[in-house]
Amino acid sequence: MAPSGTVADPPQCSTTDSFNSSDTAENDIRPFFVLHKASSGNHNGKLTGIVKSKRRIESPSPKIAKRSEVESVEEEDGQFFSTLRFKVFETVWSKIEKTIEDVLRNSNSKVFSGIHDWIRESFESIISSGALKLSEAVRSYPVLTQASSKQLLTAMVLTRNLEMVDDLLTFEELELHLKSQGCHVAKLSSMDFSAKSGVGGCLRGLLRQFVMPTVDVADVTILASWYRENKNHENPVVIIVDDTERCCGPVLSDLILILSEWAIKVPIFLIMGVSTAHDAPRKILSVNALQRLCATRFTLSSPAERMDAVLKAVFLKPCSGFTVSHKVALFMRSYFLCQDGTLTSFVRTLKIACLQHFSLEPLSIMLEHFCHDGVNQLSGEGTELLTEATMKHAFDLPSVTRNKITRSTFEMLPHFLLDLQRMPNPWSIVVLCLYEAGKFDKLRLLDIFCEILDPEARYLKYFSPSEIVNSQSHNSGRNNVIRRVLRKLRDLSPSQLSSMLKSWENLTAEFTEINDKVIELHPFMRAVEAAGQRQGLPNSPKKHASRSNSKLEKELKAMTDKVATVIEFMLREYMKPVESVPFHEILCFKNVDKLQSALLGDPRGRIQLDLLESHDILHCVCCSQRGTTLLPSMHDTSILYKLAQEHADVINLHDWYQSFKTILIPRSSKAKQKSKSSSKSKKRKEICEEPEAPAEALIQARFCRAVMELQITGLIRMPSKRRPDFVQRVAFGS
Amino acid sequence: MPPKEESSKVTRRSTRSSASVTVENSEPIESHTPTIDDLTFGEESITIDAVLSNFPGRRSQIFDFIRLMGPLDCPTLPIMIYGGASTGKTSVVLQVLRHLNRPFVYSSCRTCYNPRILFESILNQSLLHRKCSLNGYSSAKRCDKPSDFVNLLREALSSVIKTLESTSETSRSDKPDEKPMGKMVYLILDNVDLIRDWDKGTIILQFLFSLYTVLKMPQLGIILISGLPPDVYYSNMGYTDPIPLYFPEYSEEDLRQIFLRNQPNRKLYSAFLDVVLKPFCRVTRRVEELSTTFSLLFRKFCEPLDDLGISPNEDMKRRLYSHLKPLIAHCLNEIFRVSSHPHDGETRGERRQKASYSSENREELEILDFHMSTSAKFLLLSAFLASRNPATLDASMFDSTGGMDNRKRKRKASEKSMEKKEIAEQEAVMKGPGSFPLERLLAIFQCIASVGDSSFGEEDEEEENTTGYDKENNNLMSDILLQVSSLCDANFLIKSGSCPLEGSIRYRSMVSEDLAQKVAKSLSFPLSKYLYRR
């Protein structure tokens, strides 16, 4: 993961005869200027370099002096940019991270406010039903009132994700939110509900958070007494259990039964985080405890919804300028869907991609100016960093060479960078319009984002007339996003079309070209609505009750065709993939292989292959001579694993050890050679070459170490109590 | 547990005896210092008729209890009050003591969940001690051994009895109107059946049952309230048997009287009870449960009405009944109900969507409503198949081409073998899902994940990106043991014992077939092809 300290030097520029004398003079002046700039940074070594270069200029061989100057300049640029790139990375990533945190906080704020409103409403109704006197509140026997129901007010917060990683932060923020509103909040996790410590463990956890950290005995009466002191009774008591399904069921049931006994004296609100379904406590709790819960459901946004919000904030709205290529986006989507499905891992993936981008691409320092959105800074200060070496590198980028841009137009570089900076604006507007259209089919922004990044723009073929006709019969079209949007358009009702056009108009308000196209659709929309009103059934265009209904169908079909035309216009004109723009390598990360190796590592089968074919990796001399024969010079783990292939799933340890011992002792090879009756000269040669036989204890030690390594790797399982002579081979993923 | 009854708020009169008690620590004025009066119920005494009217159906139990308590200052034997849950045991005891105005100490073995907390709770009340911030929320005396408890309790009770005697003499001369408290102190232990589940619970139970014999204090009366009958606590130790007093379940007429109390419109509620009381009494007779359900149903019952004060006629009764009828069967079977809060944004969105997509209502019900990663889904299906299918069929079921379609034909089964199959099928249903080792789960996962990869491969081939196929395959297999751990945390997999031969852990799938179908549908996986049907 650590980036290489030295950056590969860009290819040297060969001096050609095309330079005239005046150009040569200008070229000589520029390096002095750069050297002077670098020396102002308190680099003592550079002063010596300057002196040396001056001497070389005075030397009688001017060509050699020029080359040395160019080399020193290039080395200097590499070192300088390497330091600067990490500063820019920290700037860019901190902005991305803050954006993500703000988005995640806002996505849950509505649910948090709903929970707090529910708590306050219920708390007010409890208080209004009769306030208890102090002596009544702290007594040990139950209060006999009309509303003496022992129901415990409970909020079931549905996280809708199997993994708990994202939700730990969510419940911490819920705790802070409720505390800021004045509630007394305690948070318990599933580790507090262990069968060993029983109900006393979680009560002690509660009292430590509410009353004081050193409570001798965990007693509920302490909570009741504390609640009546120092105006504590003016606010409700909230207990958050963030991962309910992982708790020990009997202990949680006992806690609920105890708290419900005291629910009148201490208004307690229970918040339980549930990941699968809101009736999941039915499996965990006892019947008595379930009857004590007066449950209300709250639903958090799903991981897919939060993913869409994060994507919109980081990649579609002006954030940092950093973006990823089509392949990288596909990999990140696959990692989110196929692995653990948590937003935490997605953010980690994004950070690794960003870090690798800054460590590999020298020109990524330009992102600092993109980050600040300073156009003037780009044209002024930014160009000072563009030395001749970086100019060479910029014009050697693949996107530049493909577009046949030559060095003669290097004065145009600020112009290209300005276009590169401004490009995301119409692009993101079109993406958001597609997202609005795709919402009717529950399309996710992640899928849309991955498809439209395609550098070959394959989605444009769906707008051809033949494709539209054939789209009905394609079964595999389900997985294609743009095609689904177009097919869904035909099923929309007039009211849905109208709402979509309104949202499109809002999105494109700042972009006149697209907004005019959307506004042109208004007369057709009004015609459709008029036809619908005449029919009297605006939401059911499919019925064939009369001729006016067929007229409505015609109007609707014409309308959807025009909407599809607008979509095609938006895609063709403004949906240019970032990878088709010159100089996009400055802000776009493309190396998907590095990202994959950083995240996934090698699959489990790779371990087995490496052990079986160690020669292919080591390329040692001894193994190549003998072919596939086992040799004592091989690694012990490889020897043992190859021997294990001869056994079934269950390996006898004694047999395994004997085979291992046979490999290590060279006496057996002597006997084999003798039995073959080879020549005397071969005998002498082998006697001299073979090392001494290792001791029995050493063989056993090496055997035990190798077996232990195989166990740690997960390839075998150690003997069980009933069969101490055998180990079992774990064979999967091969 | 207790039936509903109103509690009148009365300012407690301060007596001269409370002023005479010396306070060791000076506390703030707001806080309350426990006095000897706190041992009584603390409110104005009620008449016997009030007690009887508060508890319909408990007349004989109340009179028996008062008779067992005996007249003022009369020693009494230990009493055990037992019966099912929510039959009024605790409430009757407390109200009778309120009627008699006698001092008592109450501790529940649910709140006091271990011996130390129980002992210290009793001692704190006897010593008029309350845990607060001034004393660091600590008990008056530390006590976690039965022998210490006997000595400390004897000292505390002796002190209380002396105070009661002096108070009794003073109140006779000054306030002849007030009911005397007497010199008896009653120790009430509630939920004593929970002690059996404690650590060393048997020893504690024997100790509590012999407490009367050990203490030998005639001024102490012991009342045990239990959910189980006295036969459960029988042991060989010799102690005084408590006098049993049984609280049977309420009859239907008793329940009617209980629920009709304190209703603003008795006629309307009586019509409601005519509809709901009979079917619900077959399910449960617990007042606590019925009260919760009835309050929900009554609101539904009254929805068509504008005025809640009217007397319904027959036609109106029929209309209200038809309005309520669809809910009754639903509530009869449901134990745990989760209501929706109006602030839940997701519910609003879902409702709006359902309104606009009426044709897709069924699809929404079938959609998996929480997020799982793809590998976790395949693993869940693997666990489901491993639990349902016999292990011997894995080789034929999960070969390279996959599925049951490979079978050319089945043998025609005779009636005898079909009968045997039906018997075996019923036995399998009774046993529930089977257990499987981890290796079998991972082998099945590898097979069906490769089937799933081929569908991914189709998508990638369409996009002319063949490298994606290999990467997808690698993606599904990594961190597979972490996915197993996640499924265990979510209670989709549970560990069920160990294999008797090899000692390894075996797993069991707790996934319902509906959930498995949902997961398979989200993956486009042909689950029915791999599921063995007997």
Swiss-Prot record, chain A:
One of its GO terms (biological process) is lateral root development. Residues 1-25, 532-554 are annotated as: Disordered. Follow a cell-cycle regulation with a peak at the G1/S-phase. Mostly expressed in siliques and flowers, and, to a lower exent, in flower buds, leaves, roots and stems. InterPro entries: ORC3, ORC3_N, ORC_WH_C. It is found in: Nucleus. Induction: Regulated by E2F. Accumulates rapidly after cell cycle reactivation by sucrose addition following cell cycle arrest mediated by sucrose deprivation. The keyword DNA-binding applies. The keyword DNA-binding applies. One of its GO terms (molecular function) is DNA binding. Its main location: nucleus. Residues 12-24 have a biased composition (Polar residues). One of its GO terms (cellular component) is origin recognition complex. It comes from the Eukaryota. Belongs to the ORC3 family. Component of the origin recognition complex (ORC) that binds origins of replication. DNA-binding is ATP-dependent. The specific DNA sequences that define origins of replication have not been identified yet. Component of the origin recognition complex (ORC) composed of at least ORC1 (ORC1A or ORC1B), ORC2, ORC3, ORC4, ORC5 and ORC6. ORC is regulated in a cell-cycle and development dependent manner. It is sequentially assembled at the exit from anaphase of mitosis and disassembled as cells enter S phase. Interacts directly with ORC1A, ORC2, ORC4, ORC5 and ORC6. This is Origin of replication complex subunit 3. The lineage of its organism: Eukaryota, Viridiplantae, Streptophyta, Embryophyta, Tracheophyta.
Curated annotation (Swiss-Prot), chain B:
Residues 1-36, 397-428 are annotated as: Disordered. Pfam families: AAA_16, ORC5_C, ORC5_lid. One of its GO terms (cellular component) is nucleus. One of its GO terms (molecular function) is ATP binding. One of its GO terms (biological process) is DNA replication. SUPFAM superfamilies: P-loop containing nucleoside triphosphate hydrolases. Residues 414-424 have a biased composition (Basic and acidic residues). ATP binds at residues 83-90. Induction: Accumulates 13 hours after cell cycle reactivation by sucrose addition following cell cycle arrest mediated by sucrose deprivation. It is found in: Nucleus. Follow a cell-cycle regulation with a peak at the G1/S-phase. Mostly expressed in flower buds and cauline leaves, and, to a lower exent, in roots, leaves and stems. Expressed at low levels ubiquitously. Keywords: ATP-binding, DNA replication, Nucleotide-binding, Nucleus. A motif (Nuclear localization signal) lies at residues 129-136. It comes from the Eukaryota. Belongs to the ORC5 family. Component of the origin recognition complex (ORC) composed of at least ORC1 (ORC1A or ORC1B), ORC2, ORC3, ORC4, ORC5 and ORC6. ORC is regulated in a cell-cycle and development dependent manner. It is sequentially assembled at the exit from anaphase of mitosis and disassembled as cells enter S phase. Interacts directly with ORC1A, ORC1B, ORC2, ORC3, ORC4 and ORC6. Component of the origin recognition complex (ORC) that binds origins of replication. DNA-binding is ATP-dependent. The specific DNA sequences that define origins of replication have not been identified yet. ORC is required to assemble the pre-replication complex necessary to initiate DNA replication. This is Origin of replication complex subunit 5. It comes from Arabidopsis thaliana.
